[in-house]
Amino acid sequence: NLLQFRKMIKKMTGKEVVWYAFYGCYCGGGGK
């Protein structure tokens, strides 16, 4: 569930989910 994932990430990192998603996309699958 995406909503649960967002809550988990925010709880774990304390960072905004949008930033995490952008960072994950940029570093993981988007670019190098």
From Swiss-Prot:
The reaction(s) this protein catalyses: a 1,2-diacyl-sn-glycero-3-phosphocholine + H2O = a 1-acyl-sn-glycero-3-phosphocholine + a fatty acid + H(+)
Principal subcellular localisation of the protein: secreted
Transmembrane segments: none
Compartments it resides in: Secreted
GO molecular function: calcium ion binding; phospholipase A2 activity; toxin activity
InterPro entries registered for this protein in UniProt: PLipase_A2 (IPR001211), PLipase_A2_dom (IPR016090), PLipase_A2_dom_sf (IPR036444)
Highest taxon of source: Eukaryota
GO biological process, one term: phospholipid metabolic process
Cofactor binding description: Binds 1 Ca(2+) ion.
Tissue/organ expression: Expressed by the venom gland.
Keywords: Calcium, Hydrolase, Lipid degradation, Lipid metabolism, Metal-binding, Neurotoxin, Presynaptic neurotoxin, Secreted, Toxin
Residue positions binding Ca(2+): 26, 28, 30
Gene Ontology CC terms, in alphabetical order: extracellular region
Cofactor: Ca(2+)
EC number per UniProt: 3.1.1.4
Summary of the function given for this chain in its UniProt record: Snake venom phospholipase A2 (PLA2) that inhibits neuromuscular transmission by blocking acetylcholine release from the nerve termini. PLA2 catalyzes the calcium-dependent hydrolysis of the 2-acyl groups in 3-sn-phosphoglycerides.
Similarity-based family: Belongs to the phospholipase A2 family. Group II subfamily.
Official protein name in the record: Basic phospholipase A2
Organism: Gloydius halys
